């Protein structure tokens, strides 16, 4: 079976102090069972997730799954917006938190264990969440 280019999983292997790279084979298997086939891309440096997300959306991806921590999720979210407009208004974001904090996941009441969160993606419902922009200058 070919890779589903409509779903792109963007992975930060350094999340969770490098733990994500170690557990990735298990995460990949769980995601295959819960969401079906997908294309996965691993980031290699800071800022990668934003550019990889934007590129995937511009190439027709309709679902991006972020696998990493809160910082990685922030980068992926930034890839959805360009010039204060959505890159693809029909695209959806899912996430599987494997970082050390996972504050965003906790705030939405999503299970802390990645295994449970991956299982929940089977019946995930799309919810619209407002996006804000904060700029800090000194």
Predicted regions and their residues:
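Short, active-site-adjacent cap segments at secondary-structure transitions
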Residues: 72-74, 103
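Gly/Ser-rich catalytic serine loop of serine hydrolases
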Residues: 69-70, 99
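ATP/NTP phosphate-donor binding region
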Residues: 1-67, 74, 78, 115-119
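Catalytic core of DAGKc-family lipid kinases
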Residues: 34, 43, 81-138
